[in-house]
From Swiss-Prot:
Major enzyme class: transferase
Keywords: 2Fe-2S, 4Fe-4S, Biotin biosynthesis, Iron, Iron-sulfur, Metal-binding, S-adenosyl-L-methionine, Transferase
Assembly behavior: Homodimer.
Pfam families, per database record: BATS, Radical_SAM
Boundaries of every Radical SAM core domain copy: 58-285
Protein's UniProt name: Biotin synthase
Gene name in the database record: bioB
GO molecular function terms attached to this record: 2 iron, 2 sulfur cluster binding; 4 iron, 4 sulfur cluster binding; biotin synthase activity; iron ion binding
Family of this protein: Belongs to the radical SAM superfamily. Biotin synthase family.
UniProt-annotated binding residues for [4Fe-4S] cluster: 73, 77, 80
Coiled coil ranges: none
Length: 351
């Protein structure tokens, strides 16, 4: 089995630095749309310049995502096969046992991941659900892995409980722009999402927040999503950019596929508007050829989800990823002591 070259973990930006970025530029949707309109080469050149100011351009973080509770979600997100509103043939499952999750985390670490994400298909977790999840967080952190969970909407006290368990990141995506949002989901408002993100931020947990493109939105609406993310104060430390994976039985089956260059443009625009964020090349990567993935790295993506599965959709084989990164001369960040090597963006002394 080929080996991936490793590089030291980057230190995440401080809150002061991210706030300075936000103060320097409040992004209007029109300004973000203007970035999209740049000639492709000019846009990528600018994004790569910004990327090199803040990161090693030849290093990516390998993340692994595990569905710890699959299906049965009450939300009606039009893209999601885990919704009870859609007939996708997906069977709802109970929350995994703690030791099962920790075993998967050990394998992820052995395969080179430095970040382990856990996702549960809930509208919002009950307090009793958090007890085993806190054990999962503690166990994964004890392995030296960065931790992230996505559990749906949170109340303030729940976010604080996760923070006390040592959680590094909470993922809660905006999905799309405020203007297009009503076309995608009706069971949760945009403000609901923003409220959860506020609870996460107030608890001192790093924010992981991005969206999905290829939902049928316009370029202007894609610009609206990026502007919404970039204007958070501070903007998210982690920004996953997903390309719609169409699943039979969901309302978005048959949606016209997004132009591949438009996806690369979205990565580049995210990098320019959120220069210190980890921009994560997320769902939809299996449908991308190697040249397209390479362009995404050039545009500023510096993290991939690594492993054969992303929640309920497939992902490129790990060995294929190893070979691609080696051919591109890209190193995976090295597993080092966590979380000391990655600074909390809120000035806390460790999670």
């Amino acid at each position: 089995m080929s080996q991936i070259q490793t590089a030291p973990l980057p230190v995440m930006p401080s809150q002061a630095a991210a706030a300075a970025d936000a103060a320097a530029s409040r992004w209007k949707v029109a300004d973000v749309a203007a970035l999209y309109e740049l000639p492709f080469n000019d846009l990528l050149f600018r994004a790569q310049q910004v990327h090199r100011e803040h990161f090693d351009a030849n290093t990516v973080q390998l993340s692994t995502l595990l569905s710890i509770k699959t299906g049965g979600c009450e939300e009606d997100c039009a893209y999601c096969p885990q919704s009870v509103h859609h007939e996708t043939g997906l069977k709802a499952e109970k929350l995994m046992e703690v030791e099962e999750v920790l075993a998967a985390a050990r394998v992820a670490k052995e395969n080179g991941a430095t970040r382990f994400c856990m996702g549960a298909a809930w509208r919002n977790p009950k307090d009793r659900h958090l007890e085993p999840i806190k054990d999962m967080i503690r166990g994964v952190k004890s392995m030296g892995l960065e931790t992230c969970v996505t559990l749906g909407m949170l109340e303030a006290h729940q976010a604080q409980a996760l923070r006390e368990a040592g959680l590094d990141y909470y993922n809660h995506n905006l999905d799309t722009s405020p203007e297009f949002y009503g076309q995608i989901i009706s069971t949760r408002t945009y403000q609901d999402r923003l409220d959860t993100l506020e609870h996460v931020r107030d608890a001192g947990i790093n924010v992981c927040c991005g969206g999905i493109v290829g939902l049928g939105e316009s370029r202007r609406e894609r610009a609206g999503l990026i502007a919404q993310l970039a204007n958070m104060e501070p903007y998210p430390e982690s920004v996953p950019i997903n390309n719609l994976v169409q699943v039979e039985g969901t309302p978005l089956t048959g949606t016209e596929a997004l132009d591949p260059f438009e996806f690369v443009r979205t990565i580049a625009v995210a990098r320019i508007t959120m220069p210190r964020a980890m921009v994560r090349l997320s769902a939809g990567r299996e449908q991308m050829d190697e040249a397209l993935q390479a362009m995404c790295f050039l545009a500023g993506a510096n993290s991939i989800f690594y492993g054969d599965q992303l929640l309920t959709t497939s992902n490129p084989q790990a060995e294929a990823d190893r070979k691609l990164l080696a051919r591109l001369g890209i190193r995976a960040e090295a597993a080092q002591q966590m979380p000391a090597e990655r600074e909390c963006s809120h000035g806390c002394e460790g999670h």
